[in-house]
Regions:
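ALDH superfamily catalytic-core signature
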Residues: 5-149, 211, 259-260
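Conserved C-terminal structural/oligomerization subdomain of aldehyde/semialdehyde dehydrogenase
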Residues: 34, 117, 132, 139-265
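Periplasmic-binding protein-like
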Residues: 1-2
Length: 265
């Protein structure tokens, strides 16, 4: 199964009394993208925008949380906002071609709007407001909101173009923030040294861990899946055959050949 955590949990519960059924769940994520020491802010901003807003944020691997070193916060956020302001949102065959299209339906757009307003009313600070140009259609603009000061952040997958931003002081705090979720699908580090990435890779809790790459677009030649509420096995990618089938042991000889050497009268 590939889909939301709630649906995956319901499927798992339904099949709990059926040990003959293999249940491989690839569910959603509250995915972190950490931007660390890098002078390449334009490239970092492009990775952030691709991760958060491609497909209008409707990918299980989309970045939901941007974790930024405080010393580079202003410069990076300015770059990301400038790029996000240029995004064209429209129908697939519009001209010029859009970067992102609509949400799946109006109900999804309504839910995302309510979620953004909730974050605002509970201590979030809007960096880029969520805008719905036509209330009768499910098109939403990319949105960014700083939630550093929120006392309690909902640990849910906001399946759309809302990016929550968090400031941190050091890499230990960044990794702690990245792991502050029940999910564990994908995490990316942008910038930093090879030593920083080795530390990030070893300590972050996710099934897919990237360096200087977007959170989206996992290589399906490798295992694809997560931990926690993101899933239990790897139903897609390289290990799909292991988790979506069962192994069969077989012993063979060209001809039947046997003899009983002891214990006979």
């Amino acid at each position: 199964f590939t889909g939301s955590a709630n649906t995956g949990i319901a499927i798992n519960r339904k099949l709990a009394a059926r040990p003959d059924k293999l249940v491989a769940l690839e569910m959603g994520g509250n995915n972190p993208l950490v931007v660390w020491d890098t002078p390449k802010l334009t490239d970092a901003a492009a990775i952030v925008v691709q991760s958060a807003f491609a497909s209008a944020g409707q990918r299980c691997t989309a970045a939901r949380r941007l974790i930024v070193k405080a010393s580079m916060y202003d410069a990076l956020i300015a770059e990301v906002k400038t790029l996000a302001d240029r995004i064209i949102c429209g129908a697939p065959f519009d001209s010029p071609a859009p970067f992102m299209g609509p949400l799946i339906d109006n109900a999804a757009a309504d839910g995302l709007t309510e979620s953004f307003l909730y974050l605002l009313s509970h201590g979030g600070r809007a960096i880029k407001h969520l805008v719905r140009p036509d209330e009768s259609l499910p098109f939403l603009s990319p949105a960014m909101i700083d939630v550093t000061g929120m006392r309690e952040r909902p640990d849910v997958e906001l399946f759309g173009p809302i990016l929550q931003v968090i400031q941190v002081e050091d890499l230990d705090e960044a990794i702690a923030e990245a792991n502050a979720t029940r999910f564990g699908l994908v995490a990316s580090l942008v910038g930093g040294t090879p030593q920083d990435y080795n530390r990030f890779w070893a300590q972050v809790r996710a099934g897919i861990v990237n360096w200087n790459r977007p959170t989206i677009g996992p290589a399906h030649a490798a295992p694809v899946g997560g931990v926690g509420l993101s899933g239990n096995h790897r139903p897609t990618g390289y290990y799909a055959a292991d988790y979506c089938a069962y192994p069969v042991a077989s012993g063979e000889m060209e001809q039947p050949r046997a003899a009983i050497g002891v214990g006979l009268r």
